[in-house]
Amino acid sequence: MGAALSEPTIEQFVTSDGYRHHFRRWIPSGKPKGFVLCLHGIQSHSGWYGYSSGQLCEAGYEVVFVDRRGSGLNQSERGHARHHDRLINDVVQALQDLRIRRNEIAPTVPVTLLGLSWGGKLASVVAARRQELIDGLVLLYPGIRSHFEASIMDNVKLSLAREAELFEKLIPIPLDDPVLFTGIPESQAFIREDNLSLRDVTVSFLLANREFDNLTRSAPPEIRCPAIMMLAGKDRIIDNEATSQWYRSLASQERAFFEYENACHTLEFEPDRDQWIGDLTEWLDGLRLTT
């Protein structure tokens, strides 16, 4: 796995519905060059991304990596979300809190929203709805279009579960093979043995996910901030072609794109991770305040 250069603090914030969220914060030694709020995938959590977060911190960025409600260090309501708007509101509050901190200690530097895998779907919708909160959008192998999308029958079953009000019924996440995430045996073992990884989600979460799928289709005209997308060439989860086509339709006039042809889905675990982290750092270094 490799150790992070900088160790994070583990902190908490409480959203308007009283839910207590854990997050990891990496604080640089000097005045931050920028602030980056990160959103993880459906199964992962902030603890997977210590290396890249530490590298960004060493490069001068304050990194806040939030564990989604019901995921990672958040043990309450595992795998559950009552509504898609609740997940959006969680991110909005985290961004607002981060902007307050930015305004206090480094008011002229940008705030960037980073979403990876499933978190890229959530980040895209937030960027479309609340563009005044971010100066840049980072999408790492985002779950905009995947090879694991629900079939017609899956959607029928989900609708029936909704009608039966089985909102808290747990459904296994169909990504139970670590080989889907990385080709590195040590990292596969880490994923397999990680007790904080999410293995199941509720019907209510899947309904929220379905709504996010709909919202991402209409999001591109509303995403106007500078953006960067990074894909893994050997990704078996993300439909790279469809995702790239979606990305090209963004209203943003400043779009950077990278694809790492030898990498599997989770770039964090791949041998060339210093390459993509360096590319991301260079892009962040060129970002300017827009909001």
Language-model region placement:
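N-terminal cap/lid segment of alpha/beta-hydrolase-fold proteins
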Residues: 1-28
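Short beta-strand element of the alpha/beta-hydrolase
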Residues: 33-41
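Catalytic nucleophile-loop/oxyanion-hole region of alpha/beta-hydrolase
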Residues: 43-46, 72-107
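Conserved alpha/beta-hydrolase
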Residues: 53-77
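Alpha/beta-hydrolase-fold enzymes
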Residues: 116-202
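Short beta-strand/loop motif that positions the catalytic acidic residue
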Residues: 223, 229-231, 235
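Short alpha-helix in the alpha/beta-hydrolase fold that links the catalytic acid
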Residues: 225, 239-248
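Catalytic active-site module of serine/aspartate enzymes centered on a nucleophile-bearing elbow/loop
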Residues: 256-291
